[in-house]
Amino acid sequence: MIDLKFLRENPDAVRASQRLRGEDPALVEVLLDADTARRAAISTADTLRAEQKAASKKVGKATPEERPALLAAASELAAQVKSAEAEQVVTEAAFTEAHKAISNVVIDGVPAGGEQDFALRELVGEPHPIENPKDHVELGESLGLFDMERGAKVSGARFYFLTGYGALLQLGLLQLAVQTAVANGFTLLIPPVLVKPEIMGGTGFLGAHADEVYHLEEDDLYLVGTSEVPIAGYHSGEILDLNNGPLRYAGWSSCFRREAGSYGKDTRGIIRVHQFDKVEAFVYCKPEDAEAEHEKILGWERQMLGHIEVPYRVIDVAAGDLGSSAARKFDCEAWVPTQRAYRELTSTSNCTTFQARRLAVRYRDESGKPQIAATLNGTLATTRWLVAILENHQQPDGSVRVPTALVPFVGTEVLEPK
């Protein structure tokens, strides 16, 4: 949730952020009105409770003659307190709903517009010409790396088996990501992939895109689409010690997405699937350190992309393509030869204090006063990377060269057709 103090002092900035996102700026006024009504209801209820307490003391000290009138007045006050408290509950609910409806305030410099309106930050490497390139599905099946047909037979569309060297390639990629993270001071976590509603909602995944999330109704638990979710909840309700710098975690987990809004998109292969594995970087830090930390996460992502030796670009994602929690997001997109396009491999988001405010994650400032922390996240490796590796490293004879950094994990330098 956004900072109320910032909203009250800078309503025009929040309206401008809403417009940049393509969202309704009128929601700002709705929240301001709800905030005013809530504060008024709290004040009224507090005043009446104080009067009720004073009246009770008078009854205790009253003479027999005074008592009936005072009891009648106390009874009337009790009814007023009950009514005021009910109104407070109503206004609190309306305020919470209005507060949750407003997305994070975008950081200055984020480009306006939608998916295609990103700003290009950097191009790394040149796509090398490949005569009659095969796509990752044809390569993967000819090399015995994955089995789409049996995945669909067992689980349905957008499921797959990774087999043989395909499984080793993914495991090697994820292990390399873990090694990179640990070498840079991250603590490795293997988190639960089922979380409570308050954790899923606290990270911002139960808003406009709630239909993308798998929900186990009987248990009221959600399957996570990224380990960002359980790691964001790891310190919920806690006060952190950030005096020695940010807390950095790397989460290795399976991830689950319904892909409800992607009908007809990327139906072939493993680019857009219901289940995949990922190593995610997650950082808690002081708000003033968040932008520098964002650049560091991007640097670690670029280090991983360097290991797989593929051409890629770095983009500053436009405001209209940001998730509700992100104030800024950088994507690294790798070149996919058969699509003649760059496709997202990593994403790193600066969520400022938005998630931590919902999840009550705080730290103590220099005076010892608790303050809301900032959170950031970023992809260090995921299943989709196999697409870029296979297509960019394919050879004329149908084999695929294994990136040098992955050879120790895979156990061979070249994947040969079966």
UniProtKB/Swiss-Prot annotation:
Short name of one Pfam family: Seryl_tRNA_N
Keywords: Aminoacyl-tRNA synthetase, ATP-binding, Cytoplasm, Ligase, Nucleotide-binding, Protein biosynthesis
Pathway: Aminoacyl-tRNA biosynthesis; selenocysteinyl-tRNA(Sec) biosynthesis; L-seryl-tRNA(Sec) from L-serine and tRNA(Sec): step 1/1
GO biological process, one term: selenocysteine biosynthetic process
Family: Belongs to the class-II aminoacyl-tRNA synthetase family. Type-1 seryl-tRNA synthetase subfamily.
Function comment: Catalyzes the attachment of serine to tRNA(Ser). Is also able to aminoacylate tRNA(Sec) with serine, to form the misacylated tRNA L-seryl-tRNA(Sec), which will be further converted into selenocysteinyl-tRNA(Sec).
Protein's recorded name: Serine--tRNA ligase
Organism listed in the record: Mycobacteroides abscessus (strain ATCC 19977 / DSM 44196 / CCUG 20993 / CIP 104536 / JCM 13569 / NCTC 13031 / TMC 1543 / L948) (Mycobacterium abscessus)
